[in-house]
């Protein structure tokens, strides 16, 4: 019987596994990089072992260090979580060779299925050996791991070499394996997957289907179970194929078989030999704890001959610290507060006061709703996200709400091209003038408490804020009866609560301020200085860091004075395990190069300057 478990992972999945272990009376041990010294998963574990360093290659991808940590902590078993080494057969063998229990499939099954190239061969499919114009578009894909890393869509042959190079680097950074392959890219299909669970006694369960079609950068954003709109025949066919794939490699534990469904035809994508991020929707529908089932299977227990019956519908949304309107750029900073209403499940990797850094995935949490019908579950999740309190970096919360309420999603007609078609509309955020006014009035109340006054009280005060990247101006007045503004009756105003009445309708606004960061209900504003200070102007052609991150590469031979072509890649940044290429904005000469490989950069930092000849 397992009495103690080390989780070879971090963040949300480590916290989630620890929760089940605590419920079962199992002692928990975390591993934590120096960047994660005070992370939530390190705080909630019974014990923590340090992994010296910050980047994944030095820490969470060092299987040797993790095995040493497990032995030093005296645990019985190792759970890999997802990502990092979760689909690394060598790591699984090292755990077993150390005399520990591996909570996952046999190394041989991982070798057969975790490598996408091997899995496709097993399923009778071959990757492309040579790409021609007729093959386009194609998808460059990491052979190991998942989560959208190491993937590039190529629509022009001249882009293939760059896509291969970028995918290899990203895959090596995320999974410790730079192998990639190329396959045909199916446009606008639906991403459907089947959850399986197998024991050591020959029983394999297919736990229904999931739809994970809403994706950005090939990484899932919203998932649900069961997949809506499938014929009973197709749903059964997919589950039968998944069971056959598991039996073909003597699979044990949880796994996911993924398909792309287009025009009623299913195309095998891959098998993930690990727990998936989206496993909670299956848990909700089947009334299971899949982590508990993993532990039971690892202890040798047999599954029942048949799985439990599915009940209702579940939908999950991934809350990311990112700006969808700015090329999904990762965001950093302090997460001041994160709460969701009762009635939904929150799986979080961060708690109030945690710092969101640049080294790891930007996912803050997953929010899951379960209800008798799909429509009820979707409504419940959208409402919970709308009422959630999320104070801190910019997030994708608004995008999630609008996606869930979009007619294409509510009618279950979505596919993997959803955000290609609708991102611009979904990220267009019309300003709410009353929310902006509430921010200004709350600020005015705070200032008045500390002696703020004017010689001309009848003159309007002006405050300026940015909302979704746009600047807005707000005017209000101090009167003998208190604060006032045109077109609205100020019922109440203090530092944290403003009540306004507009045309007989009262609205309450909860306000919180952290420095220049202002949150009014679920809107995030930035307060601008009352008296703007002049700033140095950037030279034309300046290339600024679009996000905080690490410079991983400078174009070969690039020095000050080099001639460059418009669109030519110059600097490669890595943030939260994703690479971003900074290209020349025009044809000309490089007049400044301010960074070197390995350097940490902040948002807006000057990287280089390109000027026309």
Explain the meaning of each model-derived region:
Residues 1-257, 261-278:
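N-terminal beta-alpha lobe that positions the nucleotide/phosphoryl donor
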Residues 149-150, 223-226, 361-367, 541:
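Short amphipathic alpha-helical segments
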Residues 151-153, 184, 230, 363-372, ...:
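Short, well-ordered beta-strand elements within core beta-sheets of diverse protein domains
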Residues 156, 198-203, 261-264, 371, ...:
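Short acidic-glycine loop/turn motifs at beta-strand connectors
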Residues 185, 349, 370, 493, ...:
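Residue-level recognition of beta-strand microenvironments
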Residues 242, 280-283, 288-486, 566-569, ...:
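Catalytic cores of soluble metabolic enzymes centered on carboxylation/carboxyl-transfer
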Residues 534-613:
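Structured functional modules or segments
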């Amino acid at each position: 019987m397992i009495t103690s478990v080390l989780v070879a992972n971090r963040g949300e999945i480590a916290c989630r596994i620890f929760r089940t272990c605590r419920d079962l009376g199992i002692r928990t041990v975390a591993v934590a990089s120096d960047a994660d010294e005070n992370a939530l998963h390190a705080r909630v574990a019974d014990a923590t072992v340090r992994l010296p360093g910050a980047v994944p290659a030095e820490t969470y991808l060092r299987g040797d260090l993790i095995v040493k940590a497990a032995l030093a902590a005296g645990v019985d078993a190792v759970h890999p979580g997802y990502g990092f080494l979760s689909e690394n057969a060598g790591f699984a063998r090292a755990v077993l060779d150390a005399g520990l229990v591996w909570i996952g499939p046999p190394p041989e099954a991982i070798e057969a299925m975790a490598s996408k190239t091997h899995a496709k061969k097993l399923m009778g499919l071959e990757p492309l050996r040579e790409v021609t114009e007729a093959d386009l578009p194609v998808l460059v894909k990491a052979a190991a791991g998942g989560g959208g890393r190491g993937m590039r869509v190529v629509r022009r042959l001249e882009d293939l070499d760059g896509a291969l190079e970028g995918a290899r680097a990203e895959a090596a950074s995320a999974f410790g394996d730079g192998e990639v392959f190329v396959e045909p890219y199916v446009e606008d299909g639906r991403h459907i997957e089947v959850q399986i669970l197998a024991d050591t006694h020959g029983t394999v369960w297919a736990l229904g289907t999931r739809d994970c079609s809403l994706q950005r950068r090939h990484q899932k954003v919203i998932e649900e179970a069961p997949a809506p709109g499938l014929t009973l025949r197709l749903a059964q066919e997919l589950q039968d194929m998944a069971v056959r794939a598991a039996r073909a490699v003597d699979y044990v534990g949880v796994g996911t078989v993924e398909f792309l469904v287009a025009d009623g035809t299913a195309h095998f994508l891959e098998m993930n030999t690990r727990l998936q991020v989206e496993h909670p929707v299956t848990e909700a529908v089947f009334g299971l704890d899949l982590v508990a089932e993993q532990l039971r299977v690892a202890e040798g227990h047999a599954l029942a001959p048949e799985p439990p019956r599915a009940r209702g519908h579940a939908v999950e949304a991934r809350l990311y610290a990112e700006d969808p309107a700015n090329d999904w750029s990762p965001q950093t900073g302090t997460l001041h507060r994160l709460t969701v209403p009762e009635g939904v499940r929150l799986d979080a990797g961060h708690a109030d006061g945690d710092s969101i850094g640049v080294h790891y995935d930007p996912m803050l949490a997953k929010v899951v709703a379960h209800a008798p019908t799909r429509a009820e579950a979707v409504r419940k999740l959208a409402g919970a996200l709308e009422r959630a309190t999320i104070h801190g970096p910019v997030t994708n919360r608004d995008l999630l709400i609008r996606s869930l309420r979009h007619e294409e999603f509510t009618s279950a007609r979505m596919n993997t091209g959803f955000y290609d078609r609708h991102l611009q509309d979904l990220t267009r955020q019309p300003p709410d003038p009353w929310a902006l006014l509430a921010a200004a009035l709350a600020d005015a109340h705070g200032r008045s408490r500390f002696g703020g006054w004017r010689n001309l009280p009848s003159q309007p005060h002006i405050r300026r804020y940015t909302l979704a990247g746009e600047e807005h101006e707000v005017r209000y007045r101090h009167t003998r009866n208190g604060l006032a503004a045109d077109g609205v009756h100020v019922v109440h105003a203090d530092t944290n609560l403003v009540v306004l009445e507009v045309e007989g309708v009262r609205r309450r606004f909860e306000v919180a301020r952290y420095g220049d960061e202002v949150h009014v209900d679920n809107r995030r504003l930035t307060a601008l200085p009352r008296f703007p200070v002049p700033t140095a102007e950037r030279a034309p052609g300046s290339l600024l860091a679009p996000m905080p991150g690490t410079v991983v590469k400078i174009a070969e031979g690039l020095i000050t004075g080099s001639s460059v072509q418009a669109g030519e890649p110059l600097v490669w940044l890595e943030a939260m395990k994703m690479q971003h290429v900074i290209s020349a904005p025009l044809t000309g000469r490089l007049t400044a190069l301010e960074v070197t490989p390995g350097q940490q950069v902040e948002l807006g930092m000057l990287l280089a300057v390109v000027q026309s000849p």
